[in-house]
Amino acid sequence: MRPTPEMSFAIRHFGCQSGINITASHNPREYNGYKAYWDDGAQVLAPHDKGIIDEVNKISSATDIKFEGNKDLIQIVGEEVDSVYLNKVKTISIDPEVIKRQKDLKIVYTPIHGTGMMLIPRALKQWGFENVHTVPEQMVKSGDFPTVVSPNPENAEALSMAIDLAKKIDADIVMASDPDADRVGMACKNDKGEWVLINGNQTCLLFLYYIIKNRIAMGK
C-alpha cells in the first residue's frame, strides 16, 4: 500500500513502461478501480487510453486473461522505493532554514485510512518538523473508510476528526490526504481563532506564491 505520487516517481526511477494503482482515490469505496499510468509517470492519455480500452473490450470472461510476461519485470512499490522517494522529496524544500525556525509548528495530519500514513508523517519528520500529530482512528488501514462519508480531504466532514484534535491540542495547522495521497486538504485558524478550510485552489496559490517569492529572494 503506497501513495499514487510515489508510484509515478517509481515509473520514472525504474524506467518502467507503465504503472498500475488500485484505488478509489478520494471517492467512496464503491468507486474502487484501476488507475493506469504511462512511462512518463502520468495517467494514460490519448491515444494509449483508447488502445487499452479496445483490448479490454475484447475480453468476454476473466478466464480469458492469461499472463505470459516475465514476472521479474513487475516491480511492487515498497520500502526500497520509499527510501529513494523520501530522499528525493527532501531535496525539493525551498528553504530548509525556514523549517528549522518553524520546527515546533504543531501539525495535525490524517491519511483518512489511506496510503498517506505510509510516508507523509515520515516525510514531515525528515524535513525537520518535530511536532506532528496524527488522528489515531484514521491511521487504521481500511478500504471501507469507516470514519467518513466520503474520503475527500477538501470536504469539511472528512476533516472533522482532525479539526477536533487540532482544537484539543491547540494545533497550528491541519493537513489531510485522500486515500491514495494525491490530493490534499488543509485547515488553519482565521484572525478570530476559528478553524477554516483551505480549498485546493487556495492551497495551490499559496504554494505558488511561496515558491516564486523565495526563488526571487534567492536569485533563482
What residues fall within each predicted segment?
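Proline/glycine-rich low-complexity loops and linkers
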Residues: I59-V81, N190-K220
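Gly/Ser/Thr-enriched, mixed-charge loops and adjacent short helices
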Residues: N32-A158, L165
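Short, surface-exposed connector motifs at secondary-structure boundaries
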Residues: V98-K106, D170, R215-K220
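N-terminal small/polar loop signature for handling phosphorylated ligands or for N-terminal nucleophile
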Residues: M1-Y31, E130-M186
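Well-ordered alpha-helical segments embedded in enzymatic catalytic cores
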Residues: E6-M7, V84-K88, A158-M161, T203, ...
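Short glycine/threonine-rich loop-to-helix capping motif typified by GTGT followed
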Residues: F9-H13, T115-R122, C188-N190
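Short, glycine-/Ser/Thr-/acidic-enriched flexible segments
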Residues: R2, S25-N27, G41-A42, D49, ...
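Short Gly/Thr/Asp-enriched flexible loops that form oxyanion-binding sites at enzyme active sites
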Residues: Y31-W38, D182-G200
